[in-house]
A protein has these predicted regions:
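Phosphate-binding site recognition
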Residues: 1-347
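A cross-kingdom feature that marks ATP-driven nucleic-acid transaction machinery
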Residues: 312, 318, 323-493
Length: 493
């Protein structure tokens, strides 16, 4: 476990990974220049933001204030109590947040002091003018001019936190740090769950993703002992109504501050989980017109539950994907059997859901992991540095069909030049791949060349969780443009 940190501030040993985040926070919090500065830390709940910021405040002798859903008056009293603990001396009455921010900035004139306000959206809900107050005190003539306070605003309500620095928001242009704490990448997640078997790692990640709190807090360190223990683990954890993880996917949607019609939003997520990835397909599934779901789609994107992925080969086309694996698992496996699951019938339901789990959960998720592999790959894997990684559809008019490219890797765009294709890839989780998959990718490569893409030197990649036929393996040895990626390669450092 790395203990990397900023100059003179090693990362605490109890923090797993997060080296880059720690270095960024330490660099911001120890900046000795005069003038209060602002940092914004966001990310979905349970990613370890509070854990990270508490460690920072403790390491640097700063202030950590966890806000609650309370009135302004009560929040100010609690904030005053925190200031008293920090200063170890009386604090004058704080009539409002103007007094509070001015007093706070006056505490740290001699050396930089990190001040963390966690769950900041709770304070904004009760005191909508607070961002404007902070903006004024950070500005010319404000109390922050002679201060060295390093104010860090943190929150999990992504729509609120994203809006703090957007458009005409008061704090736009004021932040010296904007840090989003993401889930662990798939390789880090495997290490976090102490899983060395790559097949088990994929199955595990397809259920819980890279959210650290699911293991530490919601499951009390319960993880599958080996591949044979995966099915029993699913039954005793995520399908067990006695565990907090059982209802977690429902709570994730409830956190969205703009969500007024939960049934519509759940239906949109169910549509995507069922494979309806376009706005038209989603609208048809939920029984609404396309223009009636544009707002729910935007809100789900703002909440980081959905992502909109452009088709790399068809301009203006895009598909939607669920970001949080647990939500996909819930919509595909749990929602339709919720009443029986609450009665403790998880074992029977799980055994009857294996086909759906493989096709709707693991298959699409494995494709996403392969795209993540491509994003992180060295330039020699594709014959050049990836500029954009995604998926796309290539129309084959002659054969009246479409070729879906699961992992498309494009070189960085160059003005005045055709877009260069580095690699076209197909992904199969539970199927042995053979030469016909290569032939389909080569057909797509030829079609893209006709459409104006630069496909010279473009490689074909086959990604498989079940292996490759002997014929395909032999072809790889004689054909330099064929590349096979198995689970061991996917998880190799």
């Amino acid at each position: 476990m790395s203990t990397a940190g900023g100059p003179g501030v090693p990362k605490p040993s109890h923090l797993f990974d997060r080296d880059a985040e720690w270095q960024g926070l330490v660099s911001f919090a120890t900046d000795a220049r005069v003038g209060a500065t602002l940092g914004v830390v966001s990310g979905r709940r349970r990613q370890g933001k509070s854990y990270l910021l508490q460690a920072l405040a403790e390491a640097l002798g700063g202030i950590y204030f966890p806000a609650l859903q309370l009135t302004e008056a009560v929040s100010l009293r609690l904030f005053t109590d925190e200031l008293i603990r920090f200063t170890r001396s009386p604090v004058p009455p704080l009539r409002d947040w103007i007094d509070a921010i001015k007093f706070l900035f006056g505490l740290s004139k001699d050396h930089p002091v990190p001040v963390v306000i966690d769950e900041f959206p709770f304070l904004v809900s009760a005191s909508p003018s607070l961002p404007s107050i902070i903006q004024r005190e950070l500005g010319p003539g404000g109390s922050g001019r002679d201060s060295r306070a390093r104010l860090l605003l943190c929150g999990s309500a992504m729509s609120v936190m994203g809006g703090l620095l957007a458009g005409h928001a008061p704090l736009r242009g004021r932040a010296g740090l904007e840090l989003i704490v993401h889930p662990f990448g798939y390789r880090d997640a495997a290490r976090f769950w102490e899983t060395s078997d790559p097949k088990l790692a994929v199955l595990l990640h397809s259920v819980v993703g890279g959210t650290p709190a699911y293991r530490r807090e919601l499951l009390r360190e319960d993880s599958p002992a080996d591949l044979a223990d995966f099915d029993p683990w699913v039954i005793r954890t995520v399908l067990n109504p006695q565990t907090p993880l059982f209802r977690e996917a429902r709570y994730l949607l409830a956190e969205g501050t703009e969500i007024r019609d939960p049934s519509l939003y759940q239906s949109v997520l169910a549509a995507v989980a069922e494979g309806n990835a376009t706005s038209g397909g989603i609208a048809s599934y939920v029984g609404r017109k396309s223009n009636e779901i544009s707002h729910p789609l935007r809100v789900l994107e703002d909440c980081r539950l959905l992502s909109r992925q452009p088709d790399l080969f068809r301009s203006g086309r895009a598909t939607y994907r669920i970001v949080e694996p647990l939500v996909t698992f819930y919509q595909s496996i749990m929602s339709r059997e919720w009443a029986r699951l609450e009665l403790g019938d998880g074992r029977m339901i799980w055994h009857g859901s294996q086909g759906r789990f493989l096709s709707q959960v693991v298959g699409p998720h494995f494709e996403a992991l392969c795209r993540e592999y491509a994003i992180r790959a060295n330039s020699d894997v594709f014959g050049g540095p990836p500029g954009e990684v995604g998926s796309g559809v290539v129309a084959d008019s002659a054969n009246r069909t479409r070729i879906e490219i699961d992992v498309a890797v494009l070189a960085p765009a160059e003005h005045g030049h055709p877009r260069r294709v580095l690699s076209l890839g197909e992904v199969k989780w539970d199927r042995v791949m053979d030469v016909q998959h290569v032939e389909r990718l080569r057909r797509a490569r030829d079609l893209l060349a006709v459409k104006g893409f630069d496909t010279r030197g473009a490689r074909v990649h086959c990604y498989s969780g079940a292996g490759f036929s002997s014929e395909l393996q032999s072809a790889q040895h004689t054909d330099a443009d064929i590349h096979l990626v198995d689970l061991d390669q996917l998880y190799a450092d």
